[in-house]
C-alpha cells in the first residue's frame, strides 16, 4: 500500500490522547520517537505488546527515545484498557500517551491501515505498524506486522541502537549487529577517507572478487 515510508516527513497531525491533545511534531521535538499503532483495545496480542512497551520504557528513555501509540479506539477506551494492561504485567506502568483516531484519517496518513482486518462495522483497523521518527521529523525505519504476529521489542531496541550509531558515526551496521560489535564503512567512503575518519583502523575482507567493499571497524 502506498503511503508514508522511510525518508518521508511524518504528518504534523493533532489528535486527542490519554495525555491530552498532542501535535506530533511538537511531541517529537529534537528526539527520536517510536510511533506505533495497534489494531484494537481489549484484544489479546495488543495487550501483551503495550505491556511490553511499558516494560521497555526505561531502555528507550536511556536512548532518548519517546513512545507514542495510536489506534481507532477513543480516549476513554484507552484509559480503561490501560488498567487491564497494567494488571496483566504488574509493575509495567503505561506512562506513554496513546492517541485516538476514531475517524481513521490519521492512520491512513501514517500508512498504518491493515487492508485485511476490519471491525464489526466494516471499518479497516490499524495494522501493527511502527515508525521510528528522527529529530528531523522524518521516518528512519518502519516495521509492519499483521494482526496475528506480535512485535519483538528486543529487535525494536536493536534497531534504535543501529540507527543512532549509524547517525552518530556515519557508518552502517551489518546483519544481526549489536552494540559493541564491529560496524561497516559505507562504500562511498574511500580508503584514504576511511583512514582519516577511523584512526582506530579498519579490516577489509579478502573476497574472491578482489573488491575491497567490505570493511569493518569499531566505534565507541
UniProtKB/Swiss-Prot annotation:
Gene Ontology terms: biological process: cell redox homeostasis
Gene Ontology CC terms: cytosol; nucleus
This enzyme's EC code(s): 1.11.1.24
Domain Thioredoxin: 4-165
Subcellular compartments: Nucleus; Cytoplasm
Catalysed reaction, written as an equation: a hydroperoxide + [thioredoxin]-dithiol = an alcohol + [thioredoxin]-disulfide + H2O
Stimuli inducing this protein: By abscisic acid (ABA) and oxidative stress.
Keywords: Antioxidant, Cytoplasm, Nucleus, Oxidoreductase, Peroxidase, Redox-active center, Stress response
Pfam families: 1-cysPrx_C (PF10417), AhpC-TSA (PF00578)
GO molecular function: peroxidase activity; thioredoxin-dependent peroxiredoxin activity
Any coiled-coil regions, as ranges: none
Keyword Nucleus: yes
Motif (Bipartite nuclear localization signal): 195-218
InterPro entries: AhpC/TSA, Peroxiredoxin_AhpC-typ, Peroxiredoxin_C, PRX_1cys, Thioredoxin-like_sf, Thioredoxin_domain
Signal peptide, first to last residue: none
Enzyme class: oxidoreductase
Recorded superkingdom: Eukaryota
Active-site residues from the entry: 46
Remaining remarks: The active site is a conserved redox-active cysteine residue, the peroxidatic cysteine (C(P)), which makes the nucleophilic attack on the peroxide substrate. The peroxide oxidizes the C(P)-SH to cysteine sulfenic acid (C(P)-SOH), which then reacts with another cysteine residue, the resolving cysteine (C(R)), to form a disulfide bridge. The disulfide is subsequently reduced by an appropriate electron donor to complete the catalytic cycle. In this 1-Cys peroxiredoxin, no C(R) is present and C(P) instead forms a disulfide with a cysteine from another protein or with a small thiol molecule.
Family according to the record: Belongs to the peroxiredoxin family. Prx6 subfamily.
General function of this protein: Thiol-specific peroxidase that catalyzes the reduction of hydrogen peroxide and organic hydroperoxides to water and alcohols, respectively. Seems to contribute to the inhibition of germination during stress.
Name of this chain's protein: 1-Cys peroxiredoxin A
Species: Oryza sativa subsp. japonica
Amino acid at each position: 500500500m502506498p503511503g508514508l515510508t522511510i525518508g518521508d516527513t511524518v504528518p504534523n497531525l493533532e489528535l486527542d490522547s490519554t495525555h491530552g491533545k498532542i501535535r506530533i511534531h511538537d511531541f517529537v521535538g529534537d528526539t527520536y520517537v517510536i510511533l506505533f499503532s495497534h489494531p484494537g483495545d481489549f484484544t489479546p496480542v495488543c495487550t501483551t505488546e503495550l505491556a511490553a512497551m511499558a516494560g521497555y520504557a526505561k531502555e528507550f528513555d536511556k536512548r532518548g527515545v519517546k513512545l507514542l501509540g495510536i489506534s481507532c479506539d477513543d480516549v476513554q477506551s484507552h484509559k480503561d484498557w490501560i488498567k487491564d494492561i497494567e494488571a496483566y504485567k504488574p509493575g509495567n506502568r503505561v506512562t506513554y500517551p496513546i492517541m485516538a483516531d476514531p475517524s481513521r484519517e490519521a492512520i491512513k496518513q501514517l500508512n498504518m491501515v491493515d487492508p485485511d482486518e476490519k471491525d464489526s462495522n466494516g471499518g479497516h483497523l490499524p495494522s501493527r505498524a511502527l515508525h521510528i521518527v528522527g529529530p528531523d521529523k522524518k521516518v528512519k525505519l518502519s516495521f509492519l506486522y499483521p494482526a496475528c504476529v506480535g512485535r519483538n521489542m528486543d529487535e525494536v531496541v536493536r534497531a534504535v541502537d543501529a540507527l543512532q550509531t549509524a547517525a552518530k558515526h556515519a557508518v552502517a551496521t551489518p546483519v544481526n549487529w549489536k552494540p559493541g560489535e564491529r560496524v561497516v564503512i559505507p562504500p562511498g567512503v574511500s580508503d584514504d577517507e576511511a583512514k582519516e575518519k577511523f584512526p582506530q583502523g579498519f579490516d577489509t575482507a579478502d573476497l574472491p572478487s578482489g573488491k575491497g567493499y567490505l570493511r569493518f571497524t569499531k566505534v565507541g
